[in-house]
A protein has these predicted regions:
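Extended alpha-helical scaffolds
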Residues: 150-154, 162-165
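Acidic, His- and aromatic-enriched active-site or binding-groove loops in soluble protein domains
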Residues: 61-67, 173-198, 203, 255
Length: 419
């Protein structure tokens, strides 16, 4: 039997796995500094719940399976619904905002000819039980700071509101099929199809013109004013006021330099009600992540509660880091220790207790230990019976009395932080 992985799944080996852990830790640290708390949900959800709450857009991409009781289940295709279900079931009686975060895998089915991955790692936050510009701005700030923490040097966070397009679609008073086609074209950024739909028979010319204008509006604060001028007559002034207030807070927080207003953004999921956010890196072709406000989703579980959040794709972040030439700093082996087995065991135990990453070796001779340490990427080496460590690069000695700080921590303290 050939040892193969299923289509769309892959193994991750040492170096890449270490880099993914470093980036995950950096992003997680940002979440924690904003007072978000980690939660975990089951990998499977009831398929009927998935289908009823988030619709065919999401449920159609889910892996389905039947358990021994005959229940139809689905591997989670995204994290917003599991978090919403958790909040409704476990946090419905809580008072005040709930700040939840996660680092989890999601699974999506694709046709075999598409050649896409079917397992993805997502890092995200959900801010529950609070609404308004301040909470919208907080979600965007967390996203900006999380991307900064990854080490990416070039990225942009686009923000908009689904309320404008929905108001204009309502003003068109056309068929549900037309509205669905228009939203799909907007999400795909297919402006040719979008323009054709806005010029279709029965669509008021003023509304069609406003739609064609709005999806092309992007920029800074001035973009909000331009949208007011193009679409202000259809009842979306409140949504634009909220977006402008959020922009003010982004400027105050020092995040606006990474943010761009874009009224052409439209997420693929149907449950968004206001803020829409997506993150991009040059040349990637797909968003690094995204999210928005979904104030009606928890009502489907009988617990009405405003909510907003986002998810980042770890895989896409790693691709963007490589494309930008950003080297992820991974801490390797601090020291390789060999020599007399009993002495080696004592030294290894002592160093590990002090935070060192130590690889034990059965090698006894100094020349062989140096070569093995170099192959392992270790910073120091020693024989257990020696009184000091020896640096691999230049042969400098480091006494064990008092026990020194591990090399990675020492370097991090000099840099002023740990990555």
């Amino acid at each position: 039997m050939r040892p193969v992985t299923p289509r769309g799944f892959r193994d991750v080996l040492f170096e890449e796995a270490a880099e993914r852990r470093v980036v995950t830790a950096a992003v997680s640290d940002v979440f924690i500094r904003y007072a978000y708390r980690f939660v975990e949900t089951p990998a499977v959800e009831e398929y009927a719940t998935l289908e009823a709450v988030v619709g065919a857009t999401v449920s159609g991409a889910a892996f389905r399976l039947v358990d021994l009781d005959g229940s139809l289940l689905a591997l989670r295709p995204e994290m917003t619904l599991p978090i919403a279900r958790l909040a409704a079931a476990r946090l419905g009686g809580s008072s005040g905002p709930q700040r939840l975060c996660y680092a989890a895998d999601v699974y999506r089915e694709h046709a075999s000819l598409r050649g896409e991955s079917r397992q993805f790692a997502q890092l995200g936050v959900e801010l529950l039980a609070v609404s308004g510009p301040a909470s919208d701005a907080e979600v965007v700030c967390v996203l900006v700071d999380a991307l900064r923490a990854t080490g990416l040097t070039e990225f942009t966070v686009g923000v908009g509101t689904v309320a404008v397009l929905r108001a204009l679609i309502g003003a068109a008073a056309s068929t549900p099929e037309w509205a669905a086609s228009l939203m799909a074209a907007a999400h795909a950024r297919n402006l040719v199809a979008f323009d054709a739909l806005t010029a279709a028979q029965g669509v008021p010319s003023a509304v069609g013109s406003a739609l064609r204008t709005v999806v092309r509006i992007a920029g800074g604060r001035e973009a909000i004013a331009a949208c007011r001028e193009a679409a202000g007559a259809v009842g979306c002034a409140g949504a634009l006021d909220a977006l402008e207030s959020a922009w003010d807070l982004l400027e105050a927080a020092g995040a606006a330099d990474r943010v761009r207003v874009d009224f052409g953004i439209l997420r693929s999921f149907d449950y968004y009600t206001g803020l829409i956010v997506e993150a991009y890196a040059p040349g990637l072709g797909l968003p690094l992540g995204g999210g928005g406000r979904y104030d009606d989703l928890l009502a489907a579980f009988g617990t009405p509660m405003p909510a907003a959040g986002f998810a980042l794709s770890l895989e896409r972040v790693m691709i963007a880091l490589a494309a930008q030439g950003v080297e992820v700093a991974v801490r390797g082996v601090d020291a390789l220790v060999g020599g007399d087995p009993a002495a080696c065991a004592r030294v290894c135990s002592r160093l590990r207790a002090g935070g060192w990453r130590v690889q034990a070796s059965a090698t006894r001779t100094s020349d062989a230990l140096v070569g093995e340490a170099r192959d392992a990427g270790a910073v120091w080496w020693m024989a257990g019976e020696d009184a000091a460590l020896t640096r691999v690069s230049d042969g400098a000695a480091l006494a064990l009395e008092p026990l020194p700080a591990p090399p990675a921590l020492e370097a991090a303290n000099q840099r002023g932080g740990v990555r």
